[in-house]
C-alpha cells in the first residue's frame, strides 16, 4: 500500500485561481482549484486500490467534505489533528486518547477566547470557534493579521500558543498537533510506505514522517525533503506528479 498523507490548502488546492479546475464549491461559487493536469492525475491515483490518501487539515469535517475528491475516504484527519474520522465516523478511540493525553485544553481555549472578545483592540472580520479545540481570528489583510499576531504571541503560555497563517491568527493548545493523529493512524492501522506533504508550521512535525515532499513556498524545511521548483498552484501539480512517479516505482499496478 502506498500512503500519501497531506495538508490540503496551499499544498494540493489553491484559492482564487482563474486558470484552474475547480474542486470545491460553496453556494454555487468556486472556492479552491487545482491545475487540470493535477486534478486528472490525482483522480486517477485515487481510483487505485493500493493508493491510500489521508487528508490532514485544519479544516472541519464539513469544510473538508466540500472538496470533490474528499469522498468515501477511509481515513481523514481534521481540526489540526483534533479529530480523526474512519469511514466518515468520528473515531471514539482517538477522542479518548486526545483527552487522556491532554492534547486538547478546552478551558484554556475558552478563557482566551473570552479575553479576545472583551479586550482585544485590533478589529477582526470574524472569530471562528472550532468546537472546543481551538479558535482563529480572520483579518482584513495580512498586515493587520501580522500586527495582531505580534501582540497576541506575547500571551503564549504553557497551555496555548498563537500562530500566524496569512490573514488568520490561530489560538491552539500546545498539545494539539497533527503529528499525534498521524502517528495514531499509522500505528492503529499498520500503514506503510508513508509520503507526507504540507506547507505551514502546523505541518512541520507530521511531514518529518516518511518521505517528505514540500511546495517551494512552504514555510517549513526538512533535511531530507523534496521541494518543488514551482510555487502556488503549479507547485501542487508538481507535488502530485512526484507522488505519481513514486507510486509507479513502488507499486505493481500501472495507471492507464
Where in this protein do the model-derived segments appear?
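Hydrophobic "anchor" residues on beta-strands that sit immediately upstream
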Residues: 3-5, 75, 195
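Short, well-ordered alpha-helical microsegments
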Residues: 61-65, 145, 178-179, 203-205
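Conserved beta-strand/loop elements of the cytosolic catalytic core of P-type E1-E2 ATPases, chiefly
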Residues: 30-31, 172-176
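Mg2+-dependent phosphoryl-transfer enzymes with acidic/Ser/Thr/Gly-rich catalytic loops
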Residues: 172, 179-256
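Active-site phosphate-binding/coordination module
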Residues: 34-118
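Active-site neighborhood of HAD-like aspartate-dependent phosphohydrolases
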Residues: 1-4, 8-55
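Short loop/turn segments at strand-loop or loop-helix junctions that form parts
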Residues: 6-18, 79-81, 87, 216-218
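Acidic beta-strand-loop-alpha-helix segment within the catalytic core
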Residues: 81-169, 173-174, 187, 252
Amino acid at each position: 500500500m502506498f500512503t500519501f498523507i497531506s495538508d490540503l490548502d496551499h499544498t494540493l488546492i489553491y484559492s482564487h485561481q482563474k486558470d484552474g479546475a475547480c474542486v470545491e464549491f460553496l453556494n454555487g461559487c468556486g472556492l479552491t482549484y487545482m491545475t487540470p493536469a493535477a486534478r486528472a492525475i490525482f483522480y486517477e491515483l485515487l481510483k487505485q486500490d493500493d493508493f491510500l490518501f489521508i487528508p490532514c487539515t485544519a479544516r472541519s469535517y464539513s469544510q473538508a467534505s466540500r472538496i470533490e475528491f474528499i469522498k468515501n475516504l477511509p481515513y481523514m484527519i481534521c481540526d489540526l489533528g483534533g479529530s480523526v474520522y474512519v469511514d466518515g465516523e468520528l473515531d471514539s478511540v482517538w477522542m479518548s486518547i486526545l483527552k487522556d493525553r491532554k492534547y486538547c485544553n478546552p478551558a484554556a481555549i475558552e478563557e482566551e477566547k473570552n479575553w479576545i472578545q472583551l479586550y482585544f483592540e485590533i478589529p477582526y472580520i470574524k472569530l471562528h470557534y472550532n468546537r472546543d479545540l481551538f479558535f482563529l481570528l480572520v483579518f482584513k489583510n495580512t498586515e493587520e493579521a501580522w500586527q495582531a499576531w505580534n501582540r497576541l504571541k506575547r500571551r503564549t503560555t504553557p497551555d496555548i500558543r498563537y500562530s500566524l497563517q496569512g490573514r488568520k491568527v490561530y489560538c491552539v493548545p500546545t498539545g494539539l498537533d497533527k503529528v499525534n493523529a498521524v502517528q495514531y493512524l499509522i500505528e492503529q492501522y499498520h500503514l506503510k510506505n508513508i509520503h507526507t506533504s504540507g506547507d505551514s508550521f502546523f505541518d512541520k512535525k507530521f511531514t518529518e514522517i516518511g518521505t517528505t515532499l514540500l511546495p517551494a513556498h512552504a514555510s517549513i524545511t526538512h533535511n531530507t525533503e523534496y521541494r518543488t521548483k514551482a510555487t502556488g498552484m503549479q507547485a501542487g501539480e508538481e507535488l502530485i506528479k512526484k507522488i505519481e512517479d513514486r507510486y509507479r516505482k513502488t507499486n505493481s499496478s500501472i495507471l492507464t
